[in-house]
Amino acid sequence: MVKICCIGAGYVGGPTMAVIALKCPSVEVAVVDISVPRINAWNSDQLPIYEPGLDDVVKQCRGKNLFFSTDVEKHVREADIVFVSVNTPTKTRGLGAGKAADLTYWESAARMIADVSVSDKIVVEKSTVPVKTAEAIEKILTHNSKGIKFQILSNPEFLAEGTAIEDLFMPDRVLIGGRETTEGFAAVKALKDIYAQWVPEERILTTNLWSAELSKLAANAFLAQRISSVNAMSALCEATGANVSEVSYAVGKDSRIGPKFLNSSVGFGGSCFQKDILNLVYICECNGLPEVAEYWKQVIKINDYQKTRFVNRIVSSMFNTVSNKKIAVLGFAFKKDTGDTRETPAIDVCKGLLGDKARLSIYDPQVTEEQIQRDLTMNKFDWDHPLHLQPMSPTTVKQVSVAWDAYTATKDAHGICILTEWDEFKKLDFQRIFENMQKPAFVFDGRNVVDADKLREIGFIVYSIGKPLDQWLKDMPALA
C-alpha cells in the first residue's frame, strides 16, 4: 500500500489529502500538524475550516484510509510520498521584509524529513514557494540524508476557497514539475499515477521544477491583475457615468478575454494574491528586472487604492464625518462560502472607518468575533505567522461589536457596508432594515450584490462600485 503523508493541516493540506483518500482507497493518507487544537478539530465533527462538501468527504474516509495526527515524525518516516503544505508567509523583518517569502517553516520541515527518514522518499512542494526553492530544499535533504535518496517535485495547488472540493474533483489541470533525470521522471510518474485515478490524463501537465514553481505565482498574479484592471475601470465608470457591470460584460464577451474575474469590488483578498505578487516582485528585483517588478507592484497599488476610495466615499457621503456614527459591516470573510479572513479587504475598510472614529457593528455568517477582533488589532503581515507570534491588543477594539445577524447589525445604523458577497445578503428584508435605521440611510455596496434601484425606491441612498452615482453622491464628491 502506498503511504502518503502531508505536513500541514490547513486550507490546502486538509482538503487535498481528503480528496486523494476518497479517490484512491488503496492509498493510506496521513495529515500531520504540530497544532493539537487543529488536529483535534479535524478528528471532530467541527472541522477547523469551512468548505462546502468537505465534511462529507472527511466523514467517508476518516479512520479508514485518512488519518489526522500530531505524530509528525512517525508518519513522515513511514511515508513513500511526503507533501509539504506549510505556510510561506511574507517576511516581516530582515532581508526582503514586506516582499520575500519566509521559508522558515519549509526549511524546518525539510530538515525534519531528512532527520527521520529511513527509506527513499518523494518530497512534494504543495505550498506556494519562490522559484528555485526546490534547489534549496534539495541541498538541505542531500546534505543531511545519511545515504537516503530524495526526489523533489513541485505540485502547486490551484484551489479556490469556497469551491475547493469541486476544484479537486474536477481540476482544470494538475501540474507536476520534476528534475529531468531518470529518477526525476520516475518520481513524476509515481505522483501522476495517484492523480490519474480520477483526473483525465490530458489534464495532468508535467514540466521542469522551475516552470511548475513559477506557474503558480504567475497564475495568481494574472488573476489578481484582472481584478485590479476591472477595479481601475470602476473608478473611471463612476467618473463618467458608465456602468462597470455593462462594461465588464461587453469586454468578457470577447472570447480572448472571457467573463471570469471581471466583477468589480472593494478589492481582492485571501492568503495568496498579495503575498504571491509581492514574492514575484521580490524575485524580479533580485534578478535585475526592476521594470517587471514595477509592473506587478501596480496590481497591489490599485487594490489598495480601491479600498481607500471606498472608505473615502463612505465618509464624504455622510457629511464628511462618521465620528460616533454606527456603521453596519455585512461580511468580513474575503469572499463568500469561506470563513477565511486572511488579507480580506474588510480589514482595511474597517480600520479606515475606525480611524475616522466610526462605531462598527459587524456580521459575517462564518467568522467568529474572536477572529474579527484579532484581525483588527494585527499588523500588516502578522496574520500568516503562528498565533503566539501575533501581537494581541491588550483590549479589544472598543468601537467594534459583532452581531449574530444582519438585522441586529443594522439596527440604528447610519450606513451599511456590504463587504462579502454572501448569498443571504441578497435576500434581506431591506424595508425592515430601512425602518430601523437612522435617516438618511446609506448602503455602500462593495460587492454589487443588491438591487440598487429597489433600495432607492425604499428610500436608501445607494453607492454601488463602478455604477452611475446618486445625485446625493454627485453633490458630495469623494476624494480619490
Swiss-Prot record:
The active site is at C272. The keyword Oxidoreductase applies. Keywords: NAD, Oxidoreductase. Pfam families: UDPG_MGDP_dh, UDPG_MGDP_dh_C, UDPG_MGDP_dh_N. It comes from the Eukaryota. One of its GO terms (molecular function) is UDP-glucose 6-dehydrogenase activity. Pathway: Nucleotide-sugar biosynthesis; UDP-alpha-D-glucuronate biosynthesis; UDP-alpha-D-glucuronate from UDP-alpha-D-glucose: step 1/1. One of its GO terms (biological process) is carbohydrate metabolic process. Disruption phenotype: No visible phenotype. Displays smaller nematode-induced syncytia. Ugd2 and ugd3 double mutant displays a strong dwarf phenotype and often develops seedlings with severe root defects; cell walls have an altered sugar composition. Ugd2 and ugd3 double mutant displays abnormal nematode-induced syncytia. Substrate binds at residues 157-161, 216-223, 256-269, 334-335, 447. Disulfide bonds: none annotated. GO terms for cellular component: plant-type cell wall. It catalyses: UDP-alpha-D-glucose + 2 NAD(+) + H2O = UDP-alpha-D-glucuronate + 2 NADH + 3 H(+). NAD(+) binds at residues 8-13, 33, 38, 86-90, 127-128, 161, 272-275, 342. Its EC number is 1.1.1.22. InterPro entries: 6-PGluconate_DH-like_C_sf, NAD(P)-bd_dom_sf, UDP-Glc/GDP-Man, UDP-Glc/GDP-Man_DH_C, UDP-Glc/GDP-Man_DH_C_sf, UDP-Glc/GDP-Man_DH_dimer, UDP-Glc/GDP-Man_DH_N, UDPglc_DH_euk. Inhibited by UDP-xylose. Involved in the biosynthesis of UDP-glucuronic acid (UDP-GlcA), providing nucleotide sugars for cell-wall polymers. Required for the formation of cell wall ingrowths on the outer cell walls of nematode-induced syncytia. Belongs to the UDP-glucose/GDP-mannose dehydrogenase family. This is UDP-glucose 6-dehydrogenase 3. It comes from Arabidopsis thaliana (Mouse-ear cress). The gene is UGD3.
